[in-house]
From Swiss-Prot:
Protein's UniProt name: Probable protein adenylyltransferase MntA
Organism per entry: Haemophilus influenzae (strain ATCC 51907 / DSM 11121 / KW20 / Rd)
A Pfam family recorded for this sequence: NTP_transf_2
Motif (GSX(10)DXD motif): 34-48
Cofactors (names): Mg(2+)
Lineage: Bacteria, Pseudomonadati, Pseudomonadota, Gammaproteobacteria, Pasteurellales
EC numbers for this chain: 2.7.7.108
Length: 114
């Protein structure tokens, strides 16, 4: 895993990405991978995001994410990858170099009264 310092996007772009993810998929961990993490991005290279979950992302959530990213002020495209439907071979490639963009929200249960 790498750090945010190695993610090749501007801080204001990262803020947009994180806001969209937090609003639409707060219960998922999200990793960036690909050229923007490996230091091989060109000016308009896309941002590859893996939505990490054991269950496939539902179509409505995926469509909302795609729409939010396409309507945002980001100067490049965001490609979404559903971890649950990704082959183990490709998962291994991603695991070599990625950046955590969002951690799954932890729900805190209230203690029950005795």
């Amino acid at each position: 895993m790498t750090s945010f310092a190695q993610l090749d996007i501007k801080s204001e772009e990262l803020a947009i990405v994180k806001t969209i993810l937090q609003q639409l998929v707060p219960d998922y961990t999200v990793w960036a991978f690909g050229s923007r993490v490996k230091g091989k991005a060109k000016k308009y290279s896309d941002l590859d995001l893996a939505i990490i979950s054991e269950e496939p992302l539902d179509f409505l959530a995926r469509d909302r994410l795609k729409e939010a990213f396409s309507e945002s002020d980001l100067p490049w495209r965001v490609d979404l990858l559903d971890w649950a439907t990704t082959s183990e071979d490709f998962r291994e490639i991603i695991r070599k170099v990625y950046v955590v963009i969002q951690e799954k929200e932890k729900t805190v249960e209230k203690p029950t009264a005795l």
